[in-house]
Amino acid sequence: MTIMRKTHPLMKMVNHAFIDLPAPSNISGWWNFGSLLGLCLVIQITSGLFLAMHYTPDTLTAFSSVTHICRDVNYGWLIRYMHANGASLFFICLYLHIGRGIYYGSYSYMETWNIGILLLFLTMATAFMGYVLPWGQMSFWGATVITNLLSAIPYIGTDLVEWIWGGFSVDKATLNRFFAFHFILPFIIAAMAMVHLLFLHETGSNNPLGIPSDCDKIPFHPYYTTKDLLGIILLMAFFFTLVLFFPDLLGDPDNYSPANPLNTPPHIKPEWYFLFAYAILRSIPNKLGGVIALVLSILILALLPHIQTAKQRSLMFRPISQFLFWLLVSDVLALTWIGGQPVEPPFIIIGQIASFLYFAIILILMPIAGIIENKMLKW
């Protein structure tokens, strides 16, 4: 008799995706982050659903409803901090996942990579709108500053901003629509993640060597389910340490003050996971130029498959490109630090150098390194 998981229409889909899936035998712990991102999404949707039961998207009561969740709702403080820190965890896993994709040349799978970039944009939009909902000082001013950037778009900019705001400033209409979008987008992200997986399973996983692994495959279960389980245990240990011992470590103290349109905070800045892009935005004195650079800082990932010059896919045996990759990682960390600093010397010039370096490494230095390494193969 045939096993039920191989015949039942629904179980057959799960079986092909997570049980009998042929996987390369040599993929390392860096391949864990896909499943960890799935876990983060489940945590966010679940905790967000319970928060939405008590939250009111109204300028007069939003802040007090969040306070009510933390003080009066049973384990409300835990749900709220799990949701807030879950976003940080999501982005940590997301950036590591992208970093692994760049290092091992996973961007060669064009469809999977492009869906991944779309997922990154959707996640950033969701996180931004979620940050506005508690209606604290940094929520309000962050929303005002970031949405105002759209006014830099020629001709339609001002109309577009007022259309998004639902008025002439960030107000009740803005909060309401941001809540609606913040609620629906995670489900769209979940659907897109399914498409991401669908495209990945068309080609099969990449591996650290960057060479075809058709001759040496092993079933996903039990080998990689147990490996993923170890990643989940470690991630949860880190997550609950953050939530239970340092819940406000990654937040902004300004968000514990209710939103006040008449009082601007001295340093308006987004959450830590957007600081690198925010630093790139601020490093260009022109508003439109800054907005273009901001979008390109993420969209540049879509160019990677087209500017790949090396004959080897992975960076595992390419020392020059390895050096440039870690220089890029250091540069992104430097930009993250700069994004949280005030706009004054020496931070301005450091930010400008780091921003230039970010684009130069990806667009100029890495393709040149690939050509040099091709020549080295002949020596």
Curated annotation (Swiss-Prot):
| Compartments where found | Mitochondrion inner membrane
Residue ranges annotated as transmembrane are: 33-53, 77-98, 113-133, 178-198, 226-246, 288-308, 320-340, 347-367
Which protein is depicted?
Answer: Cytochrome b
Q: Which residues bind a ubiquinone?
A: H201
Q: How is the cofactor bound?
A: Binds 2 heme b groups non-covalently.
Q: One of this protein's GO BP terms?
A: mitochondrial electron transport, ubiquinol to cytochrome c
Report whether Transmembrane helix shows up as a keyword of the record. Answer: yes
Identify the species of origin.
Answer: Dipodomys compactus
Q: Which CDD domains match?
A: cytochrome_b_C, Cytochrome_b_N
Q: Which gene encodes it?
A: MT-CYB
Recorded GO molecular functions are: metal ion binding; ubiquinol-cytochrome-c reductase activity
Which cofactors does this gene product need?
heme b
Q: Which GO terms describe its cellular component?
A: mitochondrial inner membrane; respiratory chain complex III
